[in-house]
Amino acid sequence: MPEMGALLLTTPALAAPGELLNLSLNASAVAPEGAVLLAMLATLLVDLAGEKVSTRWVPPICYAGLGTALLLLALQWNAPLEPSFLGAFLPDHLAIAFRAVVALSTLLSLMISWRYAEQGGTPVGEYAGILLAATLGGMLLCGATDLVSVFVSLETLSVASYLLSGYMKRDARSSEAALKYLLVGSAAAAVFLYGSSLLYGLSGSTSLEAIGQALLSSPTPLAALALVFVLATVAFKIAAVPFHQWTPDVYEGSPTPVVAFLSVGSKAAGFALALRLLVGCFGSFDTQWKLLFTVLAVLSMTLGNVVALAQTSMKRMLAYSSIGQAGFVMIGLVCGTEDGFAAMVLYTAAYLFMNLGAFACIILFSIRTGSDRIADYAGLYQKDPLITLGLSLCLLSLGGIPPMLGFFGKIYLFFAGWADHQYVLVVVGLITSVISIYYYIGVIKMMVVKEPQEASDAVKAYPPVQWSTLGLPPLRVALVTCVVVTAVGGILSNPLFQWASDAVAGTPLLQQAIASVNGSSLG
């Protein structure tokens, strides 16, 4: 991205000193993050006024902050591309797309959280404030273009995630999940810092663009070692095998709305980080990191979907499912083509709705029964057809059944992989997709096919459905929204793919990588 460097170099001749600072900072680029920050501060201040005031005002404050952030992101789509904070942040189309996924995942996670938080005795203001802090870190991470801004954003997201996973203080499993997450996450942060120090020593700069140019001109074995450390951190954030060990325990022990956010928002930020670091810094090691990610993708798709077959907990099953889903997204990353990157963006957005829709159903069921055991869903159709329908559609979409949105997302990934001759990834993806359908269909069959006398004890004691109960309307809105987008989104897959393609086309970093791949293939 030489035009960015030229922009900063020519600015002094064009602007006065006071204007120079404004142009270099370009704070308007992070206006969406500013809206989230203001909402976070407001929730914490309102929380000081007491529980009743907090319960009344925190939700609308969060909706206003996140809604404003999404609106500002939409306005940035056609704005001129300018670096922010002295080149440490770049609001390109890739950043806008992933920031929108993070913000929208938080909005939907909060909508499915209120009733769950009230039932568990969780202070709403504190919970929302920490979740917004995680959102702030995730959104900044999507556009960070400097090692310092990457690390600060990464740790903001990580520390808030540790607090959220252990927020149910009365639950021993939640405390255990937080401790495991903290230990593994701290190790990943230390590994990233060491890799960053190697990159700084090799290039003399913390800018990802400058590091990429330095490694391109003089690749060394030490740079390959830095690649291994950075790749390990990225694999931890996206829960790729073999850096996935924390995922099942953390997902099972953490509060369910937190798991919903971690499975989508945190993972989306992780994939944005992967694109920034691997494509931006390690272009000279393109063959090596793609080979490593091919292995990670095969392991993630295989282990995630095979181990999910044996799970008895819905949250644990979706944890292993998310590991497999990360493997599918990695197909687009390994391709390195325009269609591959676009399919990656599209599937991440599709995963947002189908996964959060499934978690909304799980939360509703756990509120009414106190259970997340798969066996307890037996005969649910007799008592709650809405949850049964919503969960069935979301699981079918996760499995890639047509005409759901997830089917078209996988089709675009597999087509991109096949066109790039990634035959192993495509074949493994197809086989593991069939395996995933088996355990998804198993849950649906249990809910629908079981006769009334075969219903589980939890379903037999299922309370009458009362949508007017306090806190349930936002949950119902989130559930219906996710289910409708999941079911109808397949029909609109072409416009969605065009949006994803525009995101790739508006990202100079990816265009350079695509041009490099096309040039090498022609050569």
From Swiss-Prot:
The protein's name is NAD(P)H-quinone oxidoreductase subunit 2
User: Could you tell me the EC number(s) of this protein?
Assistant: 7.1.1.-
Annotated GO MF terms: NADH dehydrogenase (ubiquinone) activity; quinone binding
Q: What top-tier enzyme class does this entry carry?
A: translocase
**Keyword Membrane among record annotations:** yes
The protein's role, per its UniProt record: NDH-1 shuttles electrons from an unknown electron donor, via FMN and iron-sulfur (Fe-S) centers, to quinones in the respiratory and/or the photosynthetic chain. The immediate electron acceptor for the enzyme in this species is believed to be plastoquinone. Couples the redox reaction to proton translocation, and thus conserves the redox energy in a proton gradient. Cyanobacterial NDH-1 also plays a role in inorganic carbon-concentration.
Key words, A-Z: Membrane, NAD, NADP, Plastoquinone, Quinone, Thylakoid, Translocase, Transmembrane, Transmembrane helix, Transport
Q: Name one Pfam family in it.
A: Proton_antipo_M
Lineage of source species? Bacteria, Bacillati, Cyanobacteriota, Cyanophyceae, Synechococcales
Enumerate the Gene Ontology biological process terms: ATP synthesis coupled electron transport; photosynthesis, light reaction
Q: How does it assemble?
A: NDH-1 can be composed of about 15 different subunits; different subcomplexes with different compositions have been identified which probably have different functions.
Q: Which InterPro entries match?
A: NADH-Q_OxRdtase_suN/2 (IPR010096), ND/Mrp_TM (IPR001750)
Localization per Swiss-Prot or TrEMBL: Cellular thylakoid membrane
Question: Mainly resides where?
Answer: membrane
Record family assignment = Belongs to the complex I subunit 2 family.
Which reaction equation describes what this protein catalyses?
a plastoquinone + NADH + (n+1) H(+)(in) = a plastoquinol + NAD(+) + n H(+)(out); a plastoquinone + NADPH + (n+1) H(+)(in) = a plastoquinol + NADP(+) + n H(+)(out)
Q: Which GO terms describe its cellular component?
A: plasma membrane-derived thylakoid membrane
- Membrane protein topology class: Multi-pass membrane protein
